[in-house]
A protein has these predicted regions:
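Short, intrinsically disordered, charge-balanced linker/junction segments flanking boundaries
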Residues: 125-127
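N-terminal beta1-alpha1-beta2 submodule of the flavodoxin-like/Rossmannoid cofactor-binding fold
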Residues: 1-99, 103-123
Length: 127
């Protein structure tokens, strides 16, 4: 089985990083293929912005992220970092999200990952 572990903690040597290391050791020992996606180490940009879509056909004075995501997904023209993350999701049979709870929620980098990678019109729709 292909396992993707998405780590959202700024310190790789943290308790969360240790949990990832333990999971990798266990999963690899059981014969699985594991890839760790360390959002901080890879400097994933969690902020959705118009600059991610420089070839937009939308009106330049208004940025509507969901429409941009859908249009660029359909044109296979999403930003490179999002395409990389989507390829990882396609590869994975199992995805594990490892993160601390800060103020009763996930870290902002992971929230931004959800916002940018779970592309409207591609990974989900409102229907």
């Amino acid at each position: 089985m292909n396992v993707l572990i998405v780590l959202a903690h700024p310190e790789r040597k943290s308790f969360n990083g240790g949990l990832v290391d333990g999971a990798v050791k266990q999963l690899v020992g059981e014969g699985h293929t594991v890839e760790v996606d360390d959002l901080y180490a890879e400097q994933f940009d969690p902020v959705e912005r118009a600059e991610h879509y420089p070839h937009s056909d939308m009106a330049s004075d208004y940025f509507y992220p969901l429409n941009e995501q859908r249009a660029h997904y359909q044109q296979n023209a999403l930003p490179q970092d999002v395409q990389r993350e989507l390829a990882r999701l396609e590869w994975a049979d199992l995805v594990i999200f490892q993160f601390p709870l800060w103020w009763h929620a996930q870290p902002a980098i992971l929230k931004g990952w959800f916002d940018r990678v779970l592309v409207y019109g591609g990974r989900y729709t409102s229907r």
